[in-house]
Amino acid sequence: MKRLLLPLLAIAAATPLMAQNERAPFVIEETGRTFWRLDDAVKSIGEGQGTIVIGPGQFKECAVQAAGSITYRAAQPGSVIFDGVACDGKAALVFRGIFARVEGIIFQNIRVPDRNGSGIRLEKGDLEEDNSIFRNSEQGILTNEGPTMNVKVDRSTFSGLGGCPDGMCSHSLYIGNNASLSVTNSRFEKGTGGHYLKSRAAMTQISGNSFDDTRGRTTNYHIDLPAGSGGSITKNVFVQGRDKENYSAIIALGAEERIHRSVGLVIAGNDVSIAPGIDRETTFIGDWTHEPLRIGQNKIGPGVKLSDQR
């Protein structure tokens, strides 16, 4: 069995529940002001710029950032958990400002009536997310349509996410028609339906990630770029598991519509295989665009065809 990329998170050995202590858990780094509720800390920054440092704890709360530029940082990576609460029926953190950055936070058990419960919902502005975990929810990160929005994800884990219970699907990471998406050094695993990464962004960089489907259930594509995309998919490890709703391809390009040009999309340096003990065939790149791609050297395992046009 080949070695897969391991999560790069520095997780605390034990995560304490929110305790009664003398110091409020939400601290504005620039001023030292403290708050007992995250939403109050966010509102205190308003249209300005600031960093909220979050003390260890498991929090049954959420927040909406309506303006400004805010960084949300765990004082100790992996010691902060947002558990089971979504604002506006959407996510633990809903972003409608200019910019948001999230560092070292765990999001879990988030479910809402429309089955799009997410750790992060980006409705406006740019997002940078680093060193976090999204687990056992309907979705990890979901973004609205927004052709000027940019999303960067680094060193993070997406586990136990997604589903298509009635044909309306959620995915581990779902990006709308945005300007760009970058996903690096991250791990996708144990999907519970839908795709691991679905993006309608015009430009895509997906590099150095692990897509481990060996314990997935009723999953579909590892990467779905349904509207086409430029950019690159490089140096990733893909393993297709047994329990698939659709095992016809690892990467799907332009399967729904062609909004963005895919000419020159680089797909190289990837390691692609079907999990041991599974006797079937699949295709690494299912291409509906018929545009000239730049497919370089990839390590392709038994039963995997490099590409086909559909």
Residue ranges and their predicted role:
Residues 1-6:
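Bacterial N-terminal signal peptides that target proteins for export
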Residues 14-16:
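N-terminal signal peptide c-region/cleavage motif recognized by signal peptidases
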Residues 22-61:
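Acidic Gly/Asp/Thr-rich repetitive segments characteristic of extracellular carbohydrate-active
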Residues 23, 49, 56-61, 67, ...:
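Surface-exposed or flexible loop/turn and strand-edge residues in extracellular/cell-surface modules
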Residues 43-47, 59-73, 81-103, 108-125, ...:
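Extracellular beta-strand-rich solenoid/capping regions of secreted or surface-exposed proteins
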Residues 55-56, 69, 73-79, 99-109, ...:
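Right-handed parallel beta-helix
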Residues 84-93, 113-121, 136-145, 165-175, ...:
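Extracellular beta-strand/beta-solenoid scaffold signature
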Residues 279-310:
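Leucine-rich solenoid repeat scaffolds
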